[in-house]
Design a protein with these regions (language model features):
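A short C-terminal boundary segment appended to hydrolase-like catalytic domains
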Residues: 28, 271-403, 447-448, 453-464
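N-terminal secretory signal peptides and thylakoid transit peptides that target proteins
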Residues: 1-15
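Short acidic, glycine-rich surface-loop motifs adjacent to enzyme active sites
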Residues: 184-200
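Beta-strand-rich modules
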Residues: 425-442
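Active-site neighborhood of phospho(di)ester-bond hydrolases with catalytic His/Asp-centered motifs
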Residues: 37-38, 66-71, 99-105, 190-194, ...
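Extended active-site neighborhood of metal-dependent phosphoesterases/phosphodiesterases
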Residues: 78-185, 210-217, 233-249, 253-279, ...
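N-terminal active-site segment of His-dependent metallophosphoesterases
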Residues: 21-82
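Recognizes extended acidic, P/S/T-rich segments that occur
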Residues: 11, 384-426
Length: 464
């Protein structure tokens, strides 16, 4: 008999529990099973197709609730809320599954974000139905049929969920002064807002440190945030300190961390980057989310890819008990996550190519190709290429992301490719190229090193 992966896990968990060992997923009464997504960015009805696909997956897995950590509507329009409600009702009407939704920045002001405005008008919508203009409370309560407030407490199967709406950090701090004693018992509870908490998960925060300071008094807190659109392939998406924080990836598209040659840059056509923008952004790929299961103070987080409809990476598991180990604390990850490794015999191949740079200008590029690296138990975060002068002067350092950085590992190319604009390279001096693969905490592989190279003077004579 051939068992599906899910059947195997159910059977395996039952056997593990019977023998006194914790299995990889939790089964049975008393559990909380929670679907978690973020940044669904609904525009017109067609844009809700991925959200509906995620909802149907969560229904098939018997969730008790589905949490969306903000940016429900791309343009902050009432129609976006209504499309979400219609999508929810098609899947969950009459099931008792609880919606746990909050607002993000787009739900308040996406209707005046430059290019968003162009798209909105092109598709036949306008700011006259902006929820913030019509009244956020009114739009929310009329659409979703539930009370809206800057801070809300909702309970699902005995587990508390405290939500903090966009811009409501101060209200949350005051609310916790009056209500924080409720969460002192040690049972896991969830805090969720749109932007990350400073000093926790990857990405830039858009909030006040005061919220983090409050949560530091609750080791049983699991904080869920969205906003940054980073994929869960980045293992900095989970953080443990005085509490646990998890960054929820976007269900609509992934974005790239700053500082990479094939990442984001000037959008006015004045970019000076040589490499083209990764297609993952143009193709709007990277639809990801979580299935969280809780039993007692034990938590398992399944990372799911809704493009491929399969697990996108290995589970995270931890305990919220006060004296429990913190396996996802940054200092532990830095120490224990191994450096990437290139395949045995890997070589760096270098040639030149005629191409256009990001701004569309003709460029001669040094075309560097080498095999993809791997890191045990995780993914390579990025690659660093250095042009290192032999005379000890300052090297030229560039970083780039694999074109599959936001996708499942099976899409990782066998060969990575990087372009240097030859005008940037050392002239009239010897240098070598060094290539390093790095994990998300900055630990680097041993380098691939080119033969010694020497550029000749004369690049200044070229017409550019």
């Amino acid at each position: 008999m051939i068992l599906s992966r899910r059947s195997f896990l159910i059977g395996g968990s039952a056997a593990a529990l019977a023998s006194g060992c914790r299995g990889p997923r939790f089964i049975g009464s008393g559990d909380l099973r929670l679907g978690v997504i973020s940044d669904i960015h609904i525009r017109e009805p067609e844009s809700a197709e991925t959200t509906e696909r995620a909802f149907r997956f969560y229904r098939s897995r018997g969730v008790d609730a589905v949490l969306i950590a903000g940016d429900l509507s791309d343009w902050g329009l009432l129609s976006g809320f209504r499309i979400l409600k219609e999508t929810w009702d098609r899947v969950f009407a009459g099931t008792g599954v609880v919606p746990l939704f909050i607002t993000g920045n787009h739900d308040f002001d996406g209707w005046h974000y430059g290019d968003m405005t162009m798209e909105m008008h092109a598709l036949g919508y306008d700011e006259s139905e902006a929820a913030i203009k019509l009244g956020m409370r009114r739009c929310w309560e009329e659409t979703f049929g539930e009370h809206w407030a800057p801070v809300r407490l909702r309970t699902v199967r005995g587990f508390d969920f405290v939500s903090c709406e966009w811009g409501a950090d101060g209200e949350f701090v005051e609310w916790m002064k009056a209500n924080g004693g409720r969460f002192r018992g040690g049972k896991p509870f969830f805090f969720f807002r749109h932007s990350p908490l400073k000093g926790t998960v990857c990405g830039r925060s858009a909030g006040d440190d005061a919220v983090k300071a409050v949560l530091e008094g609750y080791p049983n807190c699991i904080a869920l945030t969205g906003h940054i659109h980073y994929p869960f392939n980045d293992d900095r998406a989970i953080w443990q300190g005085a509490f646990t924080a998890i960054s929820v990836p976007s269900l609509s598209y992934s974005t790239a961390p700053e500082g990479h040659e094939n990442g984001y840059d000037d959008r006015t056509g004045k970019s000076k980057l040589t490499m083209p923008l990764m297609t993952v952004r143009r193709d709007l790929r990277g639809d990801q989310g979580y299935l969280i299961e809780v039993r007692g103070d034990e938590v398992s987080v399944e990372r799911y890819d809704f493009d491929e409809m399969e697990d996108g990476a290995s589970d995270w598991s931890f305990s919220t008990a006060r004296d429990a180990a913190r396996p996802y604390a940054p200092e532990v990850r830095v120490r224990e996550m191994p450096a990437p490794v290139f395949p045995a015999g890997a070589k760096l191949k270098v040639t030149t190519t005629n191409t256009d740079n990001r701004a569309g200008h003709w460029t001669i590029a040094l075309d560097c190709r080498f095999p993809s690296a791997k890191v045990a138990g995780s993914r390579v975060f990025d690659y660093e290429i250095r042009a290192v002068p032999k005379d000890g002067s300052e090297p030229l350092v560039k970083r780039f992301l694999s074109p599959a950085f936001a996708l499942m590992e099976k899409f990782e190319p066998k060969v990575q490719r990087f372009w240097f604009d030859v005008a940037e390279l050392p002239q009239d001096k010897e240098y070598v190229l060094e290539v390093y693969a790095r994990n998300c905490f900055g630990r680097a592989s041993s380098p691939l090193v080119s033969a010694v190279r020497r550029g000749k003077p004369g690049l200044g004579k070229a017409v550019r």
